[in-house]
Amino acid sequence: MSRYRGPRLKKIRRLGALPGLTRKTPKSGSNQKKKFNSGKKEQYRIRLQEKQKLRFHYGLTERQLLRYVHIAGKAKRSTGQVLLQLLEMRLDNILFRLGMASTIPGARQLVNHRHILVNGRIVDIPSFRCKPRDIITTKDNQRSKRLVQNSIASSDPANLPKHLTVDTLQYKGLVKKILDRKWVGLKVNELLVVEY
């Protein structure tokens, strides 16, 4: 699948903070001019921006996001909440939220290069859907542990969501349960994404 490889700070300036995309922050004086339109164009622009926030934060293509919206639409609960739960339970996002990778693209690279085990098996698919009671560890070699060690050392344990636990000494994470809406690490209105 293709990924966004272009300038990341441009996306952050346009869409706001996207912690999964990059750790960089734009300079404070780089605010762009706000263009005010009225009517349908304004509503369309707001919905499009919310959708783009989700896409760029989680590193999804348009087709992947549509597939997740379709799956969430079949659920009996709120479509927006189910969509966020599906996206938050992806393996690359879980690694990012555990602090084992500094960004979601970095987590994708760890998974693609076969450094990550889920329940004792190598998983090389970043979109792998984790379930409650899944144990996520690194491969038992120095190179894999060193890659994760740097990220864990620089991460803040206070930002760890309640649905995850991490053992920093053994480089092991546990998914305790499916997350609540309040622990999503992105300010987004998921209902506007579903309406788009």
From Swiss-Prot:
Classification via InterPro entries: Ribosomal_uS4, Ribosomal_uS4_bac-type, Ribosomal_uS4_CS, Ribosomal_uS4_N, S4_RNA-bd, S4_RNA-bd_sf
Stretch list, region Disordered: 15-42
Domain of life: Eukaryota
A GO MF term: rRNA binding
UniProt keywords, alphabetically: Chloroplast, Plastid, Ribonucleoprotein, Ribosomal protein, RNA-binding, rRNA-binding
GO annotations of cellular component type: chloroplast; small ribosomal subunit
Any GO BP: ribosomal small subunit biogenesis
Pfam families reported for this sequence: Ribosomal_S4 (PF00163), S4 (PF01479)
Keyword Transit peptide (UniProt): no
Compartmental location: Plastid, Chloroplast
Residues spanning the signal sequence: none
PANTHER family (UniProt xref): 30S 40S RIBOSOMAL PROTEIN, SMALL RIBOSOMAL SUBUNIT PROTEIN US4M
Function of the protein: One of the primary rRNA binding proteins, it binds directly to 16S rRNA where it nucleates assembly of the body of the 30S subunit.
Subunit: Part of the 30S ribosomal subunit. Contacts protein S5. The interaction surface between S4 and S5 is involved in control of translational fidelity.
Designated name of the protein: Small ribosomal subunit protein uS4c
Lineage start: Eukaryota, Viridiplantae, Streptophyta, Embryophyta, Tracheophyta
Encoding gene, per UniProt annotation: rps4
